[in-house]
């Protein structure tokens, strides 16, 4: 026991996820990364989890690995008793029944493991423990989605190392594009093929003269696989 305690997303030949039974016994791991805060990374993670469940046939666990703000619990309106850091520290003692019992289930059907509210809770939690926990979870769920911090750190590195697919979220502002370009270059140097990196462009503002899809692709040297258009009503509803 534990001690102390969507439509299937596709692009030309590359997919965000595939059923685990198609390739291996453990589930697919998807890391959602974005190298700037406020661009829609967590919104992408939560909606992706709900969409995959809605398609049917797959169990989904969303793990909040954001070491700074961790907003998954707020966005999915769940109240945690246990969080990632507590569970990961006891990763060696994980038991399937105990692990499932501490997970929260969102009304969409997706399971959630939130981040701690206090960033200091991460201090005694190593990336190796996080990876061990994620591997354990992938043995229980068809799809494990990792929501990550908005800046590159050891946790982002650990998440992308484990992931079968890396969903890179970017916006059209210059700092986001610059950081996204560097991230994609880094992933390539780590051996990631272009088909394993899925870029989602979110238009967060209705600004005349904003970079086009073609401009973004040129800036980051990678195709934009999905675009989310600006919607004023959605922006108002989220405030």
Language-model segments: residues:
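Short coil/turn connectors at secondary-structure junctions
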Residues: 25-28, 56-58, 108, 196, ...
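C-terminal boundary of histidine-terminating zinc-finger modules
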Residues: 84, 237-239
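Conserved catalytic-core segment of NTP-binding enzymes
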Residues: 124, 128-230, 236
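Receiver (REC) domain switch/output surface
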Residues: 1-13
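Flexible beta-alpha connector loops of hexameric P-loop NTPases
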Residues: 85-92, 119-125, 173-175
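Pre-Walker A adenine-sensing motif
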Residues: 15-23
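Walker A/P-loop phosphate-binding motif and the immediately C-terminal alpha-helix
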Residues: 26-74
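Phosphate-binding loop that captures ATP/GTP phosphates
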Residues: 55-112
């Amino acid at each position: 026991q534990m001690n102390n305690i969507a439509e299937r997303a596709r692009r030309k030949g590359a997919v965000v996820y595939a059923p685990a039974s198609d390739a291996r016994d453990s589930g697919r791991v998807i890391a959602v990364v974005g190298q700037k805060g406020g661009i829609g990374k967590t919104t992408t993670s939560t909606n992706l989890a709900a969409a995959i469940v809605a398609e049917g046939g797959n169990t989904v666990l969303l793990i909040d690995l954001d070491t700074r703000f961790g907003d998954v619990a707020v966005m999915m309106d769940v109240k945690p008793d246990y969080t990632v850091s507590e569970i990961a520290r006891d990763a060696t003692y994980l038991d399937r029944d105990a692990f499932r019992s501490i997970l929260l289930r969102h009304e969409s059907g997706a399971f959630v493991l939130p981040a701690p509210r206090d960033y200091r809770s991460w201090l005694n939690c190593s990336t190796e423990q996080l990876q061990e926990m994620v591997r354990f979870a992938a043995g229980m769920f068809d799809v494990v989605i990792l929501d990550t911090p908005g800046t590159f750190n050891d946790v982002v590195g650990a998440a992308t190392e484990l992931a079968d697919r890396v969903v890179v979220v970017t916006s059209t502002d210059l700092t986001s594009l610059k950081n996204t370009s560097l991230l994609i270059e880094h992933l390539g140097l780590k051996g990631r093929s272009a088909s394993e990196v899925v870029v989602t462009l979110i238009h967060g503002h209705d600004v005349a003269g904003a970079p086009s899809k073609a401009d973004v692709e040129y800036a980051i040297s990678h195709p934009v696989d999905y675009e989310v258009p600006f919607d004023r009503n959605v922006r108002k509803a989220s405030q």
